[in-house]
Amino acid sequence: MAQNLKDLAGRLPSGPRGMGTALKLLLGAGAVAYGIRESVFTVEGGHRAIFFNRIGGVQQDTILAEGLHFRIPWFQYPIIYDIRARPRKISSPTGSKDLQMVNISLRVLSRPNAMELPSMYQRLGLDYEERVLPSIVNEVLKSVVAKFNASQLITQRAQVSLLIRRELTERAKDFSLILDDVAITELSFSREYTAAVEAKQVAQQEAQRAQFLVEKAKQEQRQKIVQAEGEAEAARMLGEALSKNPGYIKLRKIRAAQNISKTIATSQNRIYLTADNLVLNLQDESFTRGSDSLIKGKK
């Protein structure tokens, strides 16, 4: 390029001697500035660069860090890699151990190994993610999911995720990739299997409900038996008390009459009731005899 500028300056009419010299100096300065610009490049933060040489190819021993660097123009070309971790979601349909179709999705956080960038460029180029991640993720998912039944994939999800991460990390090392995180984001089954699981859950709930009703009926039956035994015992004790003290019935009549009289006295509609209506007939000789016997019994 500088030689072309010099040739162009030589073809220009000489004219006044001072003007030709100034023009040549201007063109020379432009050529020098262009050469300096082509000799300098910058590696941004979170990036690394390697050199491709027109003579020797990729330089295996040169990995450039962030900052300003120099190169030989027209012979060395910098190839810049972004080494920051980037997320990628990959979905894959696969089969479980009990031959159920499973749709599983992973979120993979990956980055290139900065120390192996020259060999990565020779094998995979710059689009290494598209070349590597989908294939190794599908491979590992099919291998791991096939070890578990469909129900185990749900109940042992943490163990499945750990196994997928371990195998996928080891597999990615073969391609100079580092996986910072692997997580299961979605796990679904076919409609038929989902319907079967829901039906099974409904049946289990119905069975549990039926068992609960049976236990409830048994408890109610035991309660009635205990209540009947208590009432029978109370009746027996009452019979013994009456046989020993007949005045107990008279006392109950007096208390009942007192309650009735109090209720009528506080009511707005007052009526006249005889002693017979109050179950308190003081003229009844049997009542008097019962009361006397009750008083004697207390003494």
From Swiss-Prot:
Pfam families: Band_7 (PF01145). Keywords: Acetylation, Cell membrane, Coiled coil, Cytoplasm, Membrane, Mitochondrion, Mitochondrion inner membrane, Nucleus, Phosphoprotein, Receptor, Repressor, Transcription, Transcription regulation. Residues 19-49, 150-174 are annotated as: Necessary for transcriptional repression. The modification N-acetylalanine is found at A2. Residues 190-238 form a coiled coil. It is found in: Mitochondrion inner membrane; Cytoplasm; Nucleus; Cell membrane. This is Prohibitin-2.
